[in-house]
């Protein structure tokens, strides 16, 4: 019997997903280098801005999802988000010497990312009935598409920026998003079954004006608001407010469902360890990128490899790790039992620690010989990428076993995305030249060593905890969703 093919609309979603990842990760690979090289920001300022931007892009999808659910529909939200991200890159590329253009461009991209990121997966979900067996394959295709974009982006945008200038690198990132949008719009006839804008809600009157007019005002003011946050380094205050709200939600869950309190505490612990992991992993876009730019010998075949290209190593490692992880989870490889959740977490952190130890070794080599080894750096980054698939997929798999998985997944993403990126900036400032004047290489060596040592200590704690409490993640059956939910 022939297996039904995927809906035609999925290929347009996959196309825009590839180009969105290309746009986002292309610009991200250039950002810290652009701030320090072109605009002359010191390390402290550059890392603070980079971490603020990286954290805020994980806050706005909450609002973007709400707007799509209440007013816009997923398809319209995706289109609006893609347009805003394209506009943001255009603003960034017009004047690469203006700090105001920088802040405004990042703010526009943050708003666009919020509308796009939270709704592209929801739009894909609309293509399937609840029990459609093609659903898992569709989401796997979407995930693979993202990896293609994130691998290609640092290579293409990095080479463009090095050969033709920053404005070309940013233009390429924005152009990719625009190409993805055009492909997506060309398939509009395949999205007839998806939810459209709620015209009745948009034309209803609230506070003396139609709702659509308030929406326009909000879309115009939001970039101004985020520009102020970035320019004045106020993002931490917004993040603190959002985290307090998230903590209150979990506390109310514990009060409302006392029988679930133990499982909720376990999820909170997962969030804590996941956040720790991503504080370390997000050093790749700031501290590690600056180290590569300044101290790694990037000559290969008489060509200087652009620093941005190293951002592709992580994505390549994630794809390769997916194959290995699938093998580990297969029935043939389980042995006596499936690897326990906390041992998987410990293994992921162990790989991260080994990666940082390799970086510390490379920094020591640079201190002695003047330059670090590109091969050692790539090996360290690959280990860090490999570690990723032992953290997030494991945590999400456990969270989604619970009845209140939607809210908890959102809070987990907030913790490991927004909070981790902001804290990563705080941690990274240990290496800033303004704090350790004239001893940059020593600062990097000490930083990488400390990160590796602290992570190894966390691994030891988690392993002891896992063996000391045999049923650490045994969950009451009434917490777990029924199989037919």
From Swiss-Prot:
Effect listed in the UniProt record for changing residue 388 to Q = Decrease in activity. Does not bind Ala-Lys dipeptide
Q: Which InterPro entries match?
A: Dipep/tripep_permease, MFS_dom, MFS_trans_sf, MFS_Transporters, POT_fam, PTR2_symporter_CS
Q: Which keywords does this chain's UniProt record carry?
A: Cell inner membrane, Cell membrane, Membrane, Peptide transport, Protein transport, Symport, Transmembrane, Transmembrane helix, Transport
Q: How does the protein associate with the membrane?
A: Multi-pass membrane protein
Gene Ontology MF term list: dipeptide transmembrane transporter activity; peptide:proton symporter activity; proton transmembrane transporter activity; tripeptide transmembrane transporter activity
CDD domains from the xrefs? MFS_DtpA_like
Q: Where in the cell is it found?
A: Cell inner membrane
Which terms in the GO cellular component ontology are assigned?
Answer: plasma membrane
Q: What residue intervals traverse the membrane?
A: 13-33, 47-67, 71-93, 103-125, 141-161, 165-185, 209-229, 235-255, 263-283, 308-328, 341-361, 376-396, 407-427, 447-467
What is an annotated GO biological process for this record, any one? dipeptide transmembrane transport
Q: Which segments sit on the Periplasmic face?
A: 34-46, 94-102, 162-164, 230-234, 284-307, 362-375, 428-446
Transmembrane helix as a keyword of this entry, yes or no, is yes
Q: Which residues lie on this side of the membrane: Cytoplasmic?
A: 1-12, 68-70, 126-140, 186-208, 256-262, 329-340, 397-406, 468-485
Description of pH dependence: Optimum pH is around 6.5.
Which SUPFAM superfamilies does the annotation name? MFS general substrate transporter
Q: Give the family this protein belongs to, as stated in its UniProt record.
A: Belongs to the major facilitator superfamily. Proton-dependent oligopeptide transporter (POT/PTR) (TC 2.A.17) family.
What PANTHER family does the record tag this protein with? PROTON-DEPENDENT OLIGOPEPTIDE FAMILY TRANSPORT PROTEIN, RESISTANCE PROTEIN MDTM, PUTATIVE-RELATED-RELATED
Functionally, this protein is described as follows: Proton-dependent permease that transports di- and tripeptides. Shows significantly higher specificity towards dipeptides than tripeptides. Has a preference for dipeptides with a C-terminal Lys residue. Can bind Ala-Lys, Lys-Ala, Ala-Ala. Can also transport alanine and trialanine.
Cite the record's note on assembly: Monomer.
Name of the protein in question = Dipeptide and tripeptide permease C
